[in-house]
């Protein structure tokens, strides 16, 4: 099996890259691709850059050039569920955009025109991730909705609106739904696994700066464990 892994930032891909065997590097379209072996699997690790457009470009290039059997998005997120803490892991059951609004034309909040309202993650990949986290016994985990938008969610009014629009949302980040949309269009199974670097409404900028490496490490540890089971 060939697995594509996408992280937006250096802190989100560093551990994975350090454990790859003999990786080759390709820079294309502002993205970095590292092809090699990790945990016995052929892996293409991608550093996409931050945000929906960067993630879409990286995912499209990854799928077109390397044709992985599945895609896993790893990295950090901001926690919205009340009982999440720094370092906890959320596995996405589905991804939605929180900053898309074409409801004037009859679409759901967060639904892009001519696209589904949500991009479900692959059930087999979800189950493998759950098993791996349970075996590790290191992190609290939840499975549910993660939302994506091109903003760092630290302003009280933005947080309140997101909670009102998506009351079931567990976490928020800036790439996953874009990756999900591209995978949906290419008909490739995908999963998003995110560890919490900050919690909504709790000194988020300072928390993100302090804990991005912790979150990146926790998420990457899950991915490495998963590769051994795929």
Swiss-Prot record:
TM segment ranges: none
Keyword Lipid metabolism: no
EC number: 3.2.2.9
GO molecular function: adenosylhomocysteine nucleosidase activity; methylthioadenosine nucleosidase activity
EC category: hydrolase
Reaction(s) the record says it catalyses: S-adenosyl-L-homocysteine + H2O = S-(5-deoxy-D-ribos-5-yl)-L-homocysteine + adenine; S-methyl-5'-thioadenosine + H2O = 5-(methylsulfanyl)-D-ribose + adenine; 5'-deoxyadenosine + H2O = 5-deoxy-D-ribose + adenine
Residues noted as binding substrate in the record, renumbered to the chain: 78, 153, 174-175
Active site per the UniProt annotation: 12 (proton acceptor), 198 (proton donor)
InterPro entries: MTA_SAH_Nsdase, Nucleoside_phosphorylase_d, Nucleoside_phosphorylase_sf
GO biological process: L-methionine salvage from methylthioadenosine; L-methionine salvage from S-adenosylmethionine; nucleoside catabolic process
Residues annotated as signal peptide: none
Record-level GO cellular component terms: cytosol
Keyword Hydrolase on entry: yes
Keywords assigned: Amino-acid biosynthesis, Hydrolase, Methionine biosynthesis
Gene3D superfamilies xrefs: Nucleoside phosphorylase domain (3.40.50.1580)
Pathway of action: Amino-acid biosynthesis; L-methionine biosynthesis via salvage pathway; S-methyl-5-thio-alpha-D-ribose 1-phosphate from S-methyl-5'-thioadenosine (hydrolase route): step 1/2
SUPFAM superfamilies the record matches: Purine and uridine phosphorylases
Top-level taxonomic group: Bacteria
Pfam families: PNP_UDP_1 (PF01048)
Family designation: Belongs to the PNP/UDP phosphorylase family. MtnN subfamily.
PANTHER family reported for this sequence: 5'-METHYLTHIOADENOSINE/S-ADENOSYLHOMOCYSTEINE NUCLEOSIDASE, 5'-METHYLTHIOADENOSINE_S-ADENOSYLHOMOCYSTEINE NUCLEOSIDASE
Function: Catalyzes the irreversible cleavage of the glycosidic bond in both 5'-methylthioadenosine (MTA) and S-adenosylhomocysteine (SAH/AdoHcy) to adenine and the corresponding thioribose, 5'-methylthioribose and S-ribosylhomocysteine, respectively. Also cleaves 5'-deoxyadenosine, a toxic by-product of radical S-adenosylmethionine (SAM) enzymes, into 5-deoxyribose and adenine.
Protein name: 5'-methylthioadenosine/S-adenosylhomocysteine nucleosidase
Annotated source species: Aeromonas hydrophila subsp. hydrophila (strain ATCC 7966 / DSM 30187 / BCRC 13018 / CCUG 14551 / JCM 1027 / KCTC 2358 / NCIMB 9240 / NCTC 8049)
């Amino acid at each position: 099996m060939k697995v594509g892994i996408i992280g937006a930032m250096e802190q989100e891909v560093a551990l994975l890259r350090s454990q790859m065997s003999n990786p080759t590097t390709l820079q294309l379209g502002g993205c970095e691709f590292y092809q090699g072996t990790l945990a016995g699997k052929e892996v293409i690790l991608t550093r996409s850059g931050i945000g929906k457009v960067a993630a879409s470009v990286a995912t499209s290039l990854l799928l077109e050039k390397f044709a992985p059997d599945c895609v896993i998005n790893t990295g950090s997120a901001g926690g919205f569920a009340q009982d999440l803490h720094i370092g906890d892991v959320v596995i996405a059951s589905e991804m939605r955009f929180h900053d898309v609004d074409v409801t004037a034309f009859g679409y759901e909040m967060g639904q892009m025109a001519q696209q589904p309202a949500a991009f479900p993650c692959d059930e087999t990949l979800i189950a493998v991730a759950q098993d791996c986290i349970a075996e590790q016994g290191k992190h609290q985990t939840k499975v549910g909705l993660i939302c994506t938008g091109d903003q760092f969610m630290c302003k009280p009014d933005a947080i309140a609106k997101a909670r009102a629009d998506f009351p079931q949302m567990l976490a928020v980040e800036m790439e996953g739904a874009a990756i999900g949309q591209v995978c949906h269009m290419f008909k490739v199974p995908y999963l998003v696994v995110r560890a919490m670097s900050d919690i909504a409404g709790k000194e988020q900028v300072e928390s993100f700066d302090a804990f991005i490496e912790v979150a990146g490490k926790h998420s990457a540890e899950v991915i490495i464990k998963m590769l051994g089971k795929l």
